[in-house]
Design a protein with these regions (language model features):
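Short loop/turn segments that connect beta-strands within beta-propeller blades
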Residues: 24-27, 77-81, 128-132, 175-178
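Blade-edge beta-strand/turn elements of extracellular beta-propeller
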Residues: 32, 79-89, 132-143, 179
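Hydrophobic or amphipathic alpha-helical targeting/insertion segments
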Residues: 9-32, 44-50, 56
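Conserved core beta-strand positions within WD40 beta-propeller blades
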Residues: 9, 54-56, 105, 158-159
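Residue-level detector of Asp-centered blade-edge/turn motifs that repeat once per structural unit
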Residues: 5-7, 49-52, 101-102, 154-156
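A flexible loop/linker signature enriched in serine peptidases of the S9 family
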Residues: 1, 12-21, 36-43, 59-73, ...
C-alpha cells in the first residue's frame, strides 16, 4: 500500500500532496520527494525499505502536462530526497516491487494495456548491481493470458507467487537465487 514501517520509522504517501514522507519515532513527518511544481506531479505507493542502501523502493506515477502518465519502479534515497531513481520502466503499469531478504534481488509485477492485472501480468526479477541499479531482467512467470499476484520472498530467498495459469488461483514457488 501507501505505508510501510521499518525499525519504527513510518514511510507513507500523503494523500493531500502525494509526496512520500518519513516519520521517525517522536519526530514530525519529513518529505522525501519534491513538492509539485513544474506541472509534473508524482504519486508513490506499494513500497518498502532497502535498508542496506538507505532508500525506499516502490511504484511511482508521474502525471505530466498534457495528460501523459508514466509509471516506473523507483528508488528514493532517504538521505538525499528527490523524485527517485528509475529502476524499471517501459511497461504501462507496475505493482509489488519486493526486495529479497538478502537485498540482492528485486521482484516486481508489470503489465500493459489493454490488459488489466487480473487478465495478464508478468513477474520479473533482477539482481541489484553495485551502483544500486538493476542488472539483467528475467521474466519468471506470466503473460497475456496469465495473471500473477502477490510475489513474496521467504526468509531463505525463495520467491512465492499466486498465478491463475490453470484457470484457478494457486500458490507457486520459484527458486531464483543467485550465487
Amino acid at each position: 500500500g501507501a505505508v510501510t514501517v521499518h525499525h519504527g520509522t513510518v514511510y507513507f504517501s500523503h494523500f493531500a500532496d502525494q509526496r512520500l514522507y518519513r516519520l521517525a519515532p517522536g519526530g514530525t513527518p519529513e518529505p522525501l520527494t519534491p513538492a509539485p511544481g513544474d506541472g509534473t506531479r508524482w504519486r508513490y505507493a506499494d513500497g518498502g525499505v532497502d535498508a542496506a542502501r538507505h532508500r525506499w523502493i516502490g511504484v511511482r506515477q508521474a502525471h505530466m502536462p498534457g495528460g501523459l502518465v508514466d509509471n516506473a519502479v523507483v528508488a528514493v534515497d532517504v538521505a538525499a530526497p528527490g523524485p527517485g531513481r528509475v529502476l524499471v520502466d517501459g511497461s504501462d503499469f507496475f505493482a509489488a516491487p519486493r526486495l529479497s531478504p538478502d537485498g540482492r534481488m528485486l521482484a516486481w509485477v508489470s503489465w500493459n494495456h489493454p490488459n488489466m492485472p487480473w487478465v495478464g501480468t508478468e513477474l520479473w526479477v533482477a539482481e541489484i548491481a553495485a551502483d544500486g541499479g538493476l542488472g539483467e531482467r528475467r521474466k519468471i512467470a506470466g503473460g497475456d493470458a496469465e495473471s500473477i499476484a502477490q510475489p513474496l520472498w521467504s526468509p531463505d530467498g525463495v520467491l512465492y507467487l499466486i498465478s491463475d495459469r490453470n484457470g484457478w488461483w494457486n500458490l507457486y514457488r520459484c527458486d531464483v537465487r543467485v550465487d
